[in-house]
A protein has these predicted regions:
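ATP/NTP-dependent adenylation/nucleotidyl-transfer catalytic domains that generate, transfer
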Residues: 1-22, 27-271
Length: 271
């Protein structure tokens, strides 16, 4: 990864990089990874909180930047989100036959946050800073499209896009050993993964992403990586034969995740 980063940045003549950091593991690992190939002054780390972001993750973002000794700015975006919502929600679109009114759902409003961060803040900052901005996505989320088009899926390079979530954690610990220092604070490894886009993703209440990475990493891997890709029907058969953990290689018990057969099947049908 370090070699690839060096070669890519050299090929596109990009010596400066802007990284949006949330206080979560994906952006922290990306920040540390880029720091391993670039001087600290060539990085700009940016935290863009809304009212849904906890003090925990905001503080972790600051600590990460301090540890990496990289320039850091915090740019709250609530007022801009509210302005976008006020412009679009209930907007009337005239047509020859009638008047159509647009409505923004809660899900749409969540995506506005991700798009504001990337297309307004990070893109503009990278231009002013004289560099590129990163996509911090991982393979688990990309496999099922858990991301926002024109939002957190944007960026010049997605360096960790071929790493499953458990590999992101492993890379984070490897980078800490590389630096011989906990550049990535220990708490980032333990805080619940969450996009923090709504009250339903409030980590202070134990809420977060809908993905159970200890299981879904291995489920999704079986769908896309083997030459003889596994089907949902085979997954269901293995589950009924009580050999799913062995077949997938999950580090956790399936029964500890899904209390009933219905829960398991509902989750399988979701993806």
């Amino acid at each position: 990864l370090r070699y690839g980063l060096k070669e890519f940045l050299s090929a596109i003549h990009a010596g400066r990089v802007v990284i949006g950091i949330s206080g979560g593991i994906d952006s922290a690992v990306n920040a540390a990874l880029y720091r391993s190939v670039l001087p600290a002054e060539n990085l700009l780390l940016v935290n863009t909180p809304t009212r849904f972001n906890s003090e925990t993750t905001k503080n972790l973002a600051r600590r990460l930047a301090e540890n990496l000794e990289a320039p850091f700015v915090e740019l709250p975006i609530d007022s801009f989100i509210n302005e976008t919502v006020s412009q679009i929600d209930d907007l009337q679109i005239p047509s020859p036959s009638d008047m159509k009114t647009l409505h923004l759902t809660g899900f749409m409003k969540e995506n506005i946050q991700a798009r504001d961060r990337s297309t307004r803040i990070l893109a503009t900052l990278s231009s002013a800073f004289g560099g590129i901005f990163t996509c911090n996505a991982n393979k688990t989320e990309l496999t099922v499209g858990y991301g926002t088009l024109y939002g957190d899926l944007s960026g010049a390079l997605a360096a960790t896009a071929d790493l499953w979530k458990h590999q992101i954690y492993a890379l984070g610990r490897t980078l800490n050993r590389y630096f011989d220092k906990n550049m990535i604070p220990d708490e980032i490894f333990t805080v619940r993964p969450s996009a923090e886009l709504s009250e339903n993703q409030d980590i202070t209440k134990g809420l977060g992403d809908p993905l159970i990475y200890e299981y879904h990493d291995f489920l999704f891997r079986s769908f896309i990586e083997p030459w003889n890709r596994i089907t949902p029907e085979e997954i269901l058969t293995w589950y009924s034969e009580n050999c799913l953990e062995e077949k997938l290689g999950t580090p956790v018990s399936i029964k500890s995740i899904f209390k009933t057969h219905h829960d398991f099947i509902t989750d399988l049908e979701k993806w």
